[in-house]
């Protein structure tokens, strides 16, 4: 049941003395934000000015956090989805005693500061996720709530609740306009994620003007329809109403909560409050002066922090240590009582792989008919999942095709949070951001599957995973025109090139079953960024490794798969399903007396990271007759074949037809390779 609670008239938050202290603390947040934006001559002052009261209540009355140990496992998480209001969280972090100095606040938006324009995970202690692209923080928080729910269901015992925390966030009008928030809110409501509580900064202002220019639906009814617990606070400065709403949300265990707080952007600014001018530019010296006068704040010094306010905020240091120490005592008791579960929990949180985690991964025998690499991927996934409890994920409603289900494991649903198969629905963008949230929470190696073509829907969240260097695995199947009859709407062309262009992303396109197994091993072990597994729909031969280079060399990005007795006349480079064609071409060429070395190149990124000596051993500089083949865009391959080399690929869209007709008509064939090599040698 979804209940609307409207807090319009409430009693004072506390007595007069405490009320004065509250106002002092709130204005401290406001003017640290105003001064930082003004000094940088860049930024967004309006949101922190309006949202300061609700953030203050949350951080000082409800948030369980430890400024001296921002990574304490059972802390509450806070996601500022409205990342443009970054000075709000920077001010809170400094005031509460995190390792973020006043000098860093004064260095807002400057080179190498810990206070970038939008919050960045890893740069600033206390920042739980990078935000800024609106809507993504909303969905990332859903991922954190899924993580909390799973760990709690798996490890908590009666009287031993070692995982019991909330995921809080502040979301904006812009967040709720973005489509990803619809996806994520729908799934969160379905899953009944009661530990998820979002404060909605309902200020009715966007960059272009009032939100009713483009945003007029009833947001509260929308969230109620999603299955959320919905409340409304009519006055963003009513601390008591905000506190009561948060208390009610915390008590609502069966639904995620949205608290719409009617705020005033740029609060206190005589000429900017409740206008678009307050959103994305400094107030200006004159308006800052008027605002300080209006709210009774001293003009000088800038970045002024009253001692009384700082003392009040810094209580978070001692209270945080007490909370953390209490949890540590509880966990020690848990370890004594449940030593095996406790040890597993510690290793899972630390990201440690169990000994022999890969022991069940098979070595696949040679098979001329073979299997699709997506099918092999499903086998390997299950072999790993048996021994790696941190591996958890699912698909955007394509699990039977992506082969992403963990066998003998039921679905993650309300009431079965201990299970590991997540059904994301047809929500690729939301899925990808949720994976980020799970990884950021800690304790997980999350994975998500869909067709490679739909990585377009995932891209913004993949990009944030790369920016944050998160350990996430993307299982992207149906990776070429090999998809066949579904046609060009579903056949990826430019997608591999697009993904390879993204920093910190490793793209793996394995050629056969054993390369697929090695690709999964890499993806599970690699914790320096996300990994793409690009997998075929169609079957590919499983190579006889007694006759070819070992599949373990996948970890070097490219390797000599089939060599010749003497210096090769030509080099043929290929990835994935086209490796078979490269081998066929080499055999044809050999019959005519042309020796061609075949190089399997599943990962450009891994190969580029190798020592130059190794790269030269695979691609000898003196062999200039080079041809690459891949059933996708040719962009980028000339880095390896040279400007005089040839690339056989597709720089146009596909068509609807059976797979063999497509490959033949588009020239993705062994015969095309042979002609290309012969032409280069003749030159």
Positions of predicted regions on the chain:
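C-terminal structured domain segments across diverse proteins
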Residues: 459, 463, 473-475, 480, ...
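A glycine-rich helix N-cap at a beta->alpha junction
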Residues: 98-108, 188-201, 224-228, 465-480, ...
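A short, small-residue-rich loop immediately preceding and capping a beta-strand
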Residues: 40, 76-77, 127-130, 160-178, ...
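Conserved acidic/glycine
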Residues: 13-52, 171, 175-176, 197, ...
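Thiamine diphosphate
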Residues: 110-122, 130, 146, 150-153, ...
């Amino acid at each position: 049941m979804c209940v609307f609670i409207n807090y319009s008239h409430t009693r004072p938050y506390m007595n007069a003395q405490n009320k004065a202290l509250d106002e002092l603390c709130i204005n401290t947040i406001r003017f640290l934000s105003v001064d930082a934006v003004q000094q940088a001559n860049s930024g967004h002052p309006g949101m922190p000015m309006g949202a300061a009261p609700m953030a203050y209540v949350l951080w000082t009355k409800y948030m369980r956090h430890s400024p001296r140990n921002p990574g304490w496992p059972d802390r509450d998480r806070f996601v500022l989805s409205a990342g443009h209001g970054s000075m709000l969280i920077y001010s809170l972090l400094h005031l509460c005693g995190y390792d973020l100095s006043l000098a860093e606040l004064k260095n807002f938006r400057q080179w190498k500061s810990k206070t970038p324009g939008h919050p960045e995970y890893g740069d600033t202690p206390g920042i739980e996720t990078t935000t800024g692209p609106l809507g993504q923080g909303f969905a990332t928080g859903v991922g954190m709530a899924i993580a909390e729910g799973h760990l709690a269901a798996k490890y908590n015992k009666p009287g031993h609740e070692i995982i019991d925390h909330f995921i809080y966030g502040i979301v904006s009008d812009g967040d709720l306009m973005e489509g990803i928030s619809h996806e994520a809110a729908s799934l969160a409501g379905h899953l009944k994620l009661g530990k998820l509580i979002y404060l909605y900064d309902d200020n009715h202002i966007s960059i272009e003007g009032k939100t009713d220019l483009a945003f007029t639906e009833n947001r509260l009814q929308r969230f109620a329809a999603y299955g959320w617990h919905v409340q409304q606070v009519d006055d963003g400065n009513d601390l008591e109403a905000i506190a009561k709403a948060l208390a009610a949300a915390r008590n609502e265990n069966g639904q995620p909560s949205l608290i719409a707080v009617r705020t005033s952007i740029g609060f206190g600014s005589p000429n900017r409050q409740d206008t678009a001018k307050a959103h994305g530019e400094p107030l200006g010296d004159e308006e800052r002066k008027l605002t300080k006068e209006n709210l009774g704040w001293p003009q000088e010094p800038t970045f002024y922090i009253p001692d009384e306010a700082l003392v009040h905020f810094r209580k978070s240091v001692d209270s945080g240590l007490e909370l953390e120490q209490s949890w540590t005592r509880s966990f020690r008791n848990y370890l004594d009582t449940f030593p095996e579960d406790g040890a597993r929990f510690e290793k899972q949180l630390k990201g440690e792989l169990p000994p022999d985690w890969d022991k069940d991964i098979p070595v696949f025998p040679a098979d001329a008919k073979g299997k699709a690499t997506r099918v092999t991927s499903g086998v390997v996934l299950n072999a790993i999942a048996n021994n790696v409890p941190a591996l958890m994920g699912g698909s955007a409603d394509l699990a039977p095709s992506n082969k992403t289900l963990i066998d003998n494991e039921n679905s993650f649903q309300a009431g079965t949070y201990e299970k590991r198969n997540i059904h994301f629905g047809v929500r690729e963008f939301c899925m990808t951001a949720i994976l980020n949230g799970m990884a950021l929470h800690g304790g997980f190696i999350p994975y998500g599957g869909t067709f490679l073509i739909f990585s377009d829907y995932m891209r913004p969240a993949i990009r944030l995973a790369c920016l944050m260097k998160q350990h996430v695995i993307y299982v992207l199947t149906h990776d070429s025109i090999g998809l066949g009859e579904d046609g060009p709407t579903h056949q990826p062309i430019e997608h591999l090139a697009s993904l390879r262009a993204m920093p910190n992303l490793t793209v793996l396109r394995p050629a056969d079953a054993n390369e697929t197994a090695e690709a999964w091993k890499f993806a599970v072990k690699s914790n320096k960024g996300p990994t793409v597994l690009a997998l075929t729909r169609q079957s590919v031969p499983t190579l006889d490794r007694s006759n070819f280079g070992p599949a373990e060399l996948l970890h070097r990005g490219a390797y000599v798969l089939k060599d010749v007795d003497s210096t090769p006349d030509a080099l043929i480079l290929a990835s994935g399903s086209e490796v078979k064609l490269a081998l066929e071409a080499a055999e044809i060429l050999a019959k005519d007396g042309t020796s061609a070395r075949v190089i399997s190149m599943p990962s450009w990124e891994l190969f580029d990271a190798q020592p130059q000596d190794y790269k030269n051993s695979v691609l000898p500089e003196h062999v200039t007759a080079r041809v690459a083949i891949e059933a996708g865009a040719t962009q980028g391959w000339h880095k390896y074949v040279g400007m005089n080399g040839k690339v056989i690929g597709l720089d146009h869209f596909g068509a609807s037809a059976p797979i063999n007709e497509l490959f033949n008509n588009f020239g993705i064939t062994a015969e095309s390779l042979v002609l290309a090599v012969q032409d280069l040698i003749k030159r």
